[in-house]
Amino acid sequence: VNAGTELAKIDSLAGILSPGLILSFVLLGIFPLIAKKVTDKIKARKVYAQWTKPVKFDRNMVVIGAGAAGLVSSYIAAAVKAKVTLVEAHKMGGDCLNFGCVPSKAIIKSAKLAHQMRHADKYGLHAATPSFSFKAVMARVHDIIKAIEPHDSVERYTGLGVDVIQGYATIVDPWTVEIKHNSGETSRLTTRSIVIAAGAQPVVPPLPGIETSGYLTSDTLWDEFAKRDDLPKRLVVLGGGPIGSELAQAFARLGSQVTQVELGDRIMVRE
């Protein structure tokens, strides 16, 4: 209403820059943001009303998941002297270190070199068909993972001031986390803040017969392929996202016959 009133007062171009009109439009712009914050606050208060907030807290923050997001969150909290507990049920480093970024880039490097050898004539060199041990290629992948592991280890983060618990966390209420330790015991911690960085897992499509096909996922193929002596002759890669596309290209360059299947209109649809 105020903006409309100020607009009605304009009788020249100079009036557009009047303090009153500018202030009116500023208020018009920020009002929805303020209203949303107030509404969200009211909704949150109603939701939280069903639980009793602790008077004292065991921790300032509990982080669930020791992947990239969880490690960074816990490190920053510890750096500002917060009392932080990091809970991880499986491997420290999460998807990036163990199943995604690190192993995929390692095998991409080997595959790129094999590809360049085949096409060395483009660089003025004699092209050659690469001869290699697939077991050695996979061993290199795992060696690189092991070389990086200490940077994401329990010992390192404990040294940084993070309380690391290996176990499975369940959120009891907005301020309480129950932890089933891998050792078998169960404990509870109250905390001011909870960071959920539990990550995700590969989606297995409900295809007829897939459960009995012996399929692999991006989580399991690294260990399973490390047991093989020879490169797989044929592969079907379901999925056209980053991991699927990286694996399809890498194994094709190493010499496998690869078929990539994507449900969408194109691969890398989010890129």
Predicted features and spans:
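N-terminal Rossmann-like FAD-binding beta1-loop-alpha1 element of flavoenzymes
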Residues: 59-86, 236, 244-253
